Amino acid sequence: MAMTQVFVIFILLATSLCNSNALPSSVINGFGYDYCIVECSITFLDDACKPLCIDRGYSDGGCIGLSPHFKCCCKK
């Protein structure tokens, strides 16, 4: 009985510490991208995103994030 109780408490703590909303921003910030402009699509990919970021004064840009919701993000 004590083992089952410890296991249930462990599972509850582990799931309460997980925050799925934090993952996309950590992916973006992990690569140094500061500013996300728009969502990328089949017609708006890296070849359109990078020049847009450079025009706005950033050094680089690309479609990053979690599939299927990639965003055009710019790097300082």
UniProtKB/Swiss-Prot annotation:
Recorded superkingdom: Eukaryota
UniProt xrefs under Pfam families: Defensin
Keywords: Antimicrobial, Disulfide bond, Fungicide, Plant defense, Secreted, Signal
Disulfide bonds: C36-C74, C40-C63, C49-C72, C53-C73
Cellular location(s): Secreted
Main localization category: secreted
InterPro entries referenced in this protein's UniProt entry, alphabetically: Defensin-like_dom
Entry's Gene Ontology cellular component terms: extracellular region
Residues of the signal peptide: 1-22
Single Gene Ontology BP annotation: killing of cells of another organism
Family listed: Belongs to the DEFL family.
Record-given protein name: Defensin-like protein 71
Organism phylogeny: Eukaryota, Viridiplantae, Streptophyta, Embryophyta, Tracheophyta
